[in-house]
């Protein structure tokens, strides 16, 4: 997998809900910045083909994970996740055929889960595969939209969702495996026509569906793996889960 796969990690966000002057991805879990855990997993599946998109406190982020064998891309304006990935596209290795996109605030994600996503994507020969999980309480997450044939036709962010769409329990984890070609074709067609006025990466799923591309869903991730850290309370919860995981392993 390492010869053809690259990973893009989104780590440029402001993290306002952390209520802290420190960049969100620099908050520590077990003495390490949460971003370091995501980088570890990315390197395991892609070797040196890992790109970290930085923005807020970019230099501090680079210093905090300075030992990592990754390259950095600077997102000068916070225009959304789609724009962040667009900034990273020119830095992809020439031999890269598949791209995995991760968020820098999911420190519990494991390499086996990512490898399973990639294998599912490659085996099916899809243009894009998103990792999805069904939750009892999906509040706060984007919802995965399915058509009458149970095919993925889009993702709707909660802020833009109707009451009916908010009842959907299948959520987007923000983790994708896509072909480089599809990513290059779809991203220029993303527009900021949403409640936040941002370029959402999630829109590539709708764009792919509408243009007849092969879009699919991969299941199987443990719930705790996809937990994002957005608040101090989330940070405490994730740290407790990581301590519990370490205790089981030992």
What do these predicted ranges mean?
Residues 28, 108, 177, 228-229:
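Short aromatic/basic micro-patch
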Residues 17, 107-108:
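A short, conserved beta-strand element in the Rossmann-like catalytic core
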Residues 7-9, 51-52, 100-101, 128-131, ...:
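Structural beta-sheet core signal
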Residues 1-20, 50:
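N-terminal nucleotide-binding beta1-loop-alpha1 segment
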């Amino acid at each position: 997998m390492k010869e053809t796969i690259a990973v893009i990690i989104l780590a440029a966000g402001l993290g306002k809900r952390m209520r802290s002057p420190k960049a969100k991805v620099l908050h520590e879990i077990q003495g390490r910045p949460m971003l370091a855990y995501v980088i570890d997993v990315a390197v395991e599946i892609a070797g040196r083909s890992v790109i970290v998109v930085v923005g807020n406190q970019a230099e501090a982020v680079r210093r905090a994970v300075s030992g990592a064998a990754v390259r950095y891309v600077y997102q000068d304006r916070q225009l959304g996740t789609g724009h962040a990935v667009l900034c990273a596209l020119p830095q992809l290795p020439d031999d890269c055929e598949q791209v995995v996109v991760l968020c820098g605030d999911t420190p519990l994600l494991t390499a086996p889960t990512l490898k399973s996503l990639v294998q599912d994507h490659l085996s099916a020969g899809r243009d894009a595969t998103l990792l999805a999980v069904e939750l009892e309480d999906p509040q706060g997450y984007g919802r995965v939209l399915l058509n009458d044939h149970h095919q993925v036709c889009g993702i709707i962010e909660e802020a833009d969702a109707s009451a009916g769409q908010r009842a959907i329990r299948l959520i987007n984890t923000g983790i994708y495996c896509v072909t480089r070609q599809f990513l290059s074709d779809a991203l220029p067609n993303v527009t900021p026509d949403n409640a936040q006025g941002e370029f959402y990466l999630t829109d590539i799923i709708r764009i792919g569906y509408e243009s007849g591309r092969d879009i699919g869903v991969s299941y199987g991730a443990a719930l705790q793996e996809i937990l994002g850290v957005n608040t101090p309370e989330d940070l405490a919860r994730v740290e407790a889960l990581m301590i519990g995981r370490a205790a089981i392993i030992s």
